[in-house]
């Protein structure tokens, strides 16, 4: 009998920003497969198998295809699996790739959304990502790509709305320079 996999977003890091549904599912799982960005407080006291796939920038202790294999194998063993991810599973969390792996094996799954840092960080700093008469649209862009040209800086530089770059701390100067190269005002906040 196949188990079920829950792709669970742990939110932006503060322990009180994870959803009640996520906490309920965590309390019932047989296996939790977690990333570095998910707080240890969410799983350290659980009475279940814990698998650290500790991904961080520039160092993947476990490759994505291996993570896919782990969650598939555990589900095929009949286990209830939580794939615990920082932020939201589908905002640069590679949750889409994990869903494809589950679908290929006809494994039931459910996504439990998490609060993405793309929204929460500006809000916690008192900055609304959208604001009537100032920014009517919001673009969430990766700040870390294998191939820089995957990001259309020319189009982004022309946008009047809010640009949020995730995972871009190491590339912030390059990102800003590319946007200004295509016409973004250097005084843009």
Feature map (PLM): residue ranges:
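A contiguous loop/helix-start segment that scaffolds small-molecule binding in enzyme catalytic cores
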Residues: 2-7, 76-81, 137, 146-189
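Class I SAM-dependent methyltransferase SAM-binding "motif I" and its flanking Rossmann-like core
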Residues: 88-90, 95-159
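Class I S-adenosyl-L-methionine
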Residues: 1-10, 15-112, 120
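Short hydrophobic/aromatic-enriched beta-strand-loop microsegments
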Residues: 49-55, 106-110, 129-136, 183-189
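Short phosphate-engaging motifs
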Residues: 25, 117, 171
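Short secondary-structure transition/capping segments
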Residues: 45-47, 64-65, 122-126, 142-143, ...
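Short, solvent-exposed amphipathic alpha-helical segments in soluble enzyme
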Residues: 21-25, 47-50, 98-101, 127, ...
């Amino acid at each position: 009998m196949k188990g079920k996999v829950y792709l669970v977003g742990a939110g932006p890091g503060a322990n009180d920003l994870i959803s009640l549904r996520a906490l309920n599912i965590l309390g019932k799982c047989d296996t939790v497969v977690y990333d570095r960005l998910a707080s240890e407080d969410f799983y350290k006291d659980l009475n279940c198998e814990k698998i650290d796939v500790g991904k961080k920038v520039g160092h993947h202790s476990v490759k994505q295809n291996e993570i896919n294999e782990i969650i598939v194998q555990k589900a095929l063993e009949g286990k209830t699996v939580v794939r615990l991810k920082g932020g939201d599973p589908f905002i640069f969390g590679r949750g889409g790739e994990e869903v494809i792996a589950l679908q290929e094996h006809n494994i039931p799954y459910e996504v439990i959304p998490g609060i993405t840092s793309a929204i929460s960080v500006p809000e916690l700093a008192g900055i609304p990502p959208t604001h009537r008469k100032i920014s009517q649209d919001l673009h969430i862009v990766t700040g870390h790509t294998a191939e820089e040209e995957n990001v259309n800086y020319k189009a982004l530089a022309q946008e009047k709305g809010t640009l949020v770059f995730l995972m871009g701390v190491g590339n912030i100067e390059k990102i800003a320079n590319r946007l200004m190269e295509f016409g973004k005002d250097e005084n843009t906040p």
